[in-house]
């Protein structure tokens, strides 16, 4: 490891001592990155409460208040000191601790198993990119479902030159566990990266409890066979489940203590979970069997270093606003109201499809039970052509996935009283195409 910064070398030694698998999963960049213990942010933090603080590039008034513009500050209901200065690269500590507590509360199967304290990133996209920086080499393939968020192409393939290998998401209207197992075991034992996104974008599918057990079993068996597994869990739509028998916990709760050869990384955020899309606050959290506080602290430091070298930090104003909001007395009720509204739209889509069997001649819905979206697969016409007809002739916008001949419909963003018309327009457009 000649040429590495001594701080990176020390972090690597700690990681290798506590988890050889985690060390072997790190990319070259992941091994080289470090949190500058004596860098500008660290030195400014050390001087924070001193009488004279001439460290960081932030302007302050003579009385110590941030030197802000009142025309901007007047729009905010929080103190200027909680909005205008820089946040730490790892995120503000009260928010990180709160999110960790929420992960534990929402995923009780974690029990007392030790996990890392989440590191704040600027949205899930940035979180995934940071994970790519730390763990993905240009020789790596990432195993994921054939129905996937198109931004993975930019995040992992364009940025890190990783290959994408797909398993079939569905077989007989259920999760295709056989295809998943085949793809996991296709290559000889070694480093393998798996990316799982539930509720799935674009399909809106979350595995059942039984399917979740089988997915975990496949991964545990692969780890037992000598594979070093990095399992990335994109939990962007976590919590939006609308059916019984469907997993209500993240797979992270099963995988964080699954095997010493499996490092689980949960990437989630307030974007969808907390209805704060433009705040750009997300989290990266680590879990591995027998993970120690020392291991997790080192991974947090490397992650913070990756954030520092990429975006410096996530906005303080967003972190502070959310932290204040989530601690309010009305937060939980407001969140339940929003989920109930999206659930009504979900059930309306189900009713419309059940009431119109004639639609099946032209399109059928992929399995869906959660999230923001559902997809229809066209049977007789081109998705591109139908998309164009809908847009130009029927003032209806959906997302087209031409390579799969799918249309994605965001019921979460569509008024309930417009959903029946949406599918009627789709039916007519398919007949015209």
Language model region names:
Residues 3-10, 28-122, 433:
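N-terminal small-domain helix-loop-helix segment of the aminotransferase-like
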Residues 79-231, 238-259, 417-419, 424-427:
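Conserved core of the PLP fold type I
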Residues 57-61, 125, 149-150, 199-202, ...:
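Short, solvent-exposed loop/turn segments at secondary-structure junctions
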Residues 4-18, 102, 256-340:
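Conserved core segment of the aminotransferase class I/II
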Residues 316, 335-350, 362-377, 402-405:
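Conserved glycine-rich beta-strand-loop-beta hairpin in the small C-terminal domain of fold type I
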Residues 51-53, 88, 267, 363-369, ...:
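Short beta-strand
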Residues 285, 375-377, 410-412:
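Short hydrophobic/aromatic beta-strand micro-patches
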Residues 2-3, 93, 101, 105-112, ...:
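PLP-dependent enzyme catalytic core of the Aspartate aminotransferase-like
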